[in-house]
């Protein structure tokens, strides 16, 4: 497949193709402009893949610009986290990291230009009064009593704002547009507000800060952005974007295009709701493996390639829709099925003793991947006492049960055929030990007499077992659309985290965070970056071997 054929197609790329063909632009320049007031989530990944992917495919540029206009909510911690997430996803920004605060002097000068043109005024209504005067979708707004101040008075008052002569909330700079506009965003929007807060980039130089709608379009223009890509909730804001650029002296006028944001089943994307999950300790942090944050997905074991593939599959449209969680899970499942080495771990262990096994043990050879001989093999210790999963044994079972049954045979993965002879139980009737015999002539081969042994189960040698904690993560919410619930916290899935104490083959003592394994017959797991220790590794389940939620929804 050629590079051109491999490219995704969507309405934004069609616009870019037309712009390049007509000569409107000779290169493509996009940007990703997050506000550093939280951690990025899977929805941001869609925007990252779109903006950086377009720049990559068209051999253009993509800027990383922090929209840092509200020092009260922002922190350098988020700046560092966002940079790390973008790089982890496999993208590189053009030149240095940019900040909207880099342009505060120019933004201030453009605000003065609007005042001089009679297109901006200092308003002393309270924030509550401004909301009241703005009107509603069905009622037009009404003019502020301060709307018709002279240019000279507005210049003096704006300087007083900058000098700290007003308290917070006592004055703001507003655009003078149309209080009767059918678009509320055009009813004299606020351009500057007062905040006495230290800024992570500019310190205490400023006590007035520009609003997003004023900052965004000018920053795009100053950086020479050709295509400014936003999600659909900014569709009406495009009118203000164009109004600002049309009314200041700036040579470049980028165009804004909107696409649908990512909505994903069984989770929430609202920063407020995600913050509530963290602050109320429903999860252990922003990187909790159940969170839709990029850091959470990474800790859970998602790969950058799987997230990029997911963003490619869902595409870019103008229609809002909700994506099934199974779509995301299938991307990581396919990636790890192809690339993850295999290992054995027993999650719910029960002891199995092979009574006729002689000697202290031996090493058996196992492929690291059944379909990729180039991934090599490993030596796994085998002995007369092993751990198997409790679900892999029954005293009685029907023919559909292809595991170990009392009086019947099963194969141990890459080892011997065994037969269950008897069991030992505790006072409550729970099986504590399964006693078996083995066929010594069946190491990785069929029985000599031709009898068929259909089932295969995994195991771990008890003498060599590595004790591990296994965290079985599942979907955070029990309903597809938790945001629609009266109280989204009431539909948290109580089974979203189940912690088990199990045993793994000893090779897993060398596991490192970020490297996935398929625990055979169990699912895909990775070492937890936060809780693991050399003495007690902790493994997170990334995803199961198959979609167990499909039956739930039927």
Curated annotation (Swiss-Prot):
MF term (GO), any: ATP binding
Catalyzed chemical reaction(s): tRNA(Gln) + L-glutamine + ATP = L-glutaminyl-tRNA(Gln) + AMP + diphosphate
Region (Interaction with tRNA): 317-324
GO cellular component, one term: cytosol
Ligase in keyword set: yes
Keywords in alphabetical order: Aminoacyl-tRNA synthetase, ATP-binding, Cytoplasm, Ligase, Nucleotide-binding, Protein biosynthesis
SUPFAM superfamilies from the UniProt entry: Nucleotidylyl transferase (SSF52374), Ribosomal protein L25-like (SSF50715)
Cited InterPro entries: aa-tRNA-synth_I_CS, Gln-tRNA-synth, Gln/Glu-tRNA_Ligase, Gln_tRNA_ligase_bac, Glu/Gln-tRNA-synth, Glu/Gln-tRNA-synth_Ib_cat-dom, Glu/Gln-tRNA-synth_Ib_codon-bd, Glu_tRNA_lig_a-bdl
One biological process term in Gene Ontology: glutamyl-tRNA aminoacylation
Short sequence motif 'KMSKS' region: positions: 268-272
Family membership: Belongs to the class-I aminoacyl-tRNA synthetase family.
Name of the protein: Glutamine--tRNA ligase
Annotated organism of origin: Shigella flexneri
Species lineage: Bacteria, Pseudomonadati, Pseudomonadota, Gammaproteobacteria, Enterobacterales
